[in-house]
């Protein structure tokens, strides 16, 4: 939870400017629609490889270049197939950061909207239809990343051989590819058709799924991917990562100062927590979050875990703090690190700041992979403890409020 001062009123543009801009805009002719990317196939590639990628969309004629915002991915060839299709050969360095990399296509008419290209650490396998049931399942060798498509009522089935006690991890990227409203369902079944593990939604991956399981006996196991409501179409593209990689979804501490070295404990893997020394990036991304790849026993996770970057002074929750009289004292501005360790847990903080100043109080939980849905309430720091304001969800399950410090020079959160 981070407390940040609100900009001075002198730095805010008057609201009347907004009305003026809107009024002028109504009299201007509509600009022509720019280029748009609707599908990227494949939507990702492995480190250290060259990948031919097809971009399909609208008004992509006279394409000049594929522009990556930050990734060190080189475009070695560009081919205009037709006004709606562009092919590019991408060279991905062996040390390219894992995860999503934002790109646009620049044409003679301008830039497309942002899309994402995913970089994985495994070799890539293309789906081979038909693979709709266990009898026709496509055999794959782990570790690998499968590129597939779920069409209407389609179920894609992949077969792996596991020894007794062998571990398998699977993670699917679908909704996060931002190509289609594709809500995938992921499950692992044994050779008799019994479900060993399943995941529909995940606290770190939103509507995408991730799971890990240990084989109770030697045999063939099947990973199935489908649309959660058995829908699908040609745009429901996915990346399925298969291997024995770790699957944590939360870091502790979940935040740190840019450029500092921290000992991170990764949480959420069924095999238990594990530790890893991490040096946080010195440069803070626009979103204020660094994507860090957990590594256990030399094996990297397929999915990075976000860690909040902030220059604010760190303040650790001091339990017990489940009532106002025991509230943790915080001198604003600060970044508060806290945990909900039990059901019905309530944490109280006494925030001290000059009276009359205005502060943002923002919770970071689900954005960092935590499964909790935070509720934030702000109260006066007096005997009555009158509620000043509060929030449950703000642009997602995490909470955010703005509060002006009362005369007491403090308030309770």
Predicted features along the sequence, with ranges:
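N-terminal secretory signal peptides that target proteins for export/translocation
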Residues: 1-14
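Bacterial N-terminal signal peptides
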Residues: 17-29
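Predominantly extracellular/luminal regions of secreted and cell-surface proteins
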Residues: 115-142, 298-334
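Hydrophobic or amphipathic alpha-helical targeting/insertion segments
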Residues: 100-104, 112-117
